[in-house]
């Protein structure tokens, strides 16, 4: 089955364009993407009754379907559609949680081009209705992860629209954001930061 991105580029798995290497565990960051680490973290939270947070499925537009049998359909071609909201949502201590997760190889700033207008609009709506909304930002080269409240992201977004910087300086993320310590279980314990930032008043 062929998957294509909105721009028409064909989706390739790592196995399609790289030779398969034997698994070598790396307990520093375990070689995982931010998404994989967060999915494992959320599974840990659910299993231990801490929070119920899920990743929203990526919307797919089906283009071509074959029917080899009357009772069975086979998808032959589909496109990943651009997500209209954020990556994750759920409930913690009776409050609605909604957040986006992004990573960059940059060491000194986080590019705002990683976010889209519709995501910012969605975050504004969540905040308007009293939900907890934030972004989790990973500097992959430094292996550092931060939680930044959506209000601050929106502030930098508005500054960009007014002719300001097209990225958030790391020093500003350190100033307004909250460092998330990395561990084994859970890998990225962002709920402990959520507890401190949003519930310890």
UniProtKB/Swiss-Prot annotation:
Entry's EC annotation: 3.1.21.10
Cofactor section: Mg(2+)
Database matches in Gene3D superfamilies: 3.40.1350.10
CC terms in the record's Gene Ontology section: cytoplasm
UniProt xrefs under SUPFAM superfamilies: Restriction endonuclease-like
Binding note for cofactor: Binds 1 Mg(2+) ion per subunit.
Pfam families (UniProt xref): RecU
Cross-referenced CDD domains: RecU-like (cd22354)
Catalytic activity entry: Endonucleolytic cleavage at a junction such as a reciprocal single-stranded crossover between two homologous DNA duplexes (Holliday junction)
A GO molecular function held by the record: nucleic acid binding
Primary location recorded for the protein, binned into one broad class: cytoplasm
Localization annotation: Cytoplasm
Keywords: Cytoplasm, DNA damage, DNA recombination, DNA repair, Endonuclease, Hydrolase, Magnesium, Metal-binding, Nuclease
Chain positions recorded as Mg(2+) binding sites: 85, 87, 100, 119
One record GO biological process: DNA recombination
Entries under InterPro entries matching the protein: Resolv_RecU, Restrct_endonuc-II-like, tRNA_endonuc-like_dom_sf
Site feature: Transition state stabilizer: 102
Biological role stated in the UniProt entry: Endonuclease that resolves Holliday junction intermediates in genetic recombination. Cleaves mobile four-strand junctions by introducing symmetrical nicks in paired strands. Promotes annealing of linear ssDNA with homologous dsDNA. Required for DNA repair, homologous recombination and chromosome segregation.
Family matches, as NCBIfam families: PRK02234.1-2, PRK02234.1-5, recU
Family assignment from sequence similarity: Belongs to the RecU family.
Protein name per its UniProtKB record: Holliday junction resolvase RecU
Species in which this protein is naturally found: Geobacillus sp. (strain WCH70)
Lineage, opening ranks: Bacteria, Bacillati, Bacillota, Bacilli, Bacillales
């Amino acid at each position: 089955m062929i998957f294509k991105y909105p721009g028409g580029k064909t989706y390739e798995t790592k196995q399609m364009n790289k030779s398969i290497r034997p698994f070598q565990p790396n307990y520093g960051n375990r070689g995982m993407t931010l998404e994989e680490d967060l999915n494992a973290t959320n599974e840990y939270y659910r299993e231990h009754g801490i929070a119920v947070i899920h990743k929203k499925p990526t919307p797919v537009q089906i283009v071509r379907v074959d029917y080899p049998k009357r009772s069975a359909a086979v998808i032959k071609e589909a496109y990943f559609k651009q997500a209209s909201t954020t990556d994750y949502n759920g409930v913690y201590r009776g409050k609605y949680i909604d957040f986006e997760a992004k990573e960059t190889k940059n060491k000194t700033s986080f590019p705002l081009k990683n976010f889209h207008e519709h995501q910012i609009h969605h975050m504004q709506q969540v905040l308007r209705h009293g939900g907890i909304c934030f972004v989790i930002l990973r500097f992959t080269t430094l292996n550092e992860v931060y939680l930044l409240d959506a209000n601050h992201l929106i502030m930098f977004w508005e500054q960009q629209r007014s002719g300001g910087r097209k990225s958030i300086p790391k020093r500003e993320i350190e100033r307004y954001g909250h460092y998330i310590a990395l561990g084994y279980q859970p890998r990225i314990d962002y709920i402990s930061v959520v507890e401190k930032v949003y519930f310890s008043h």
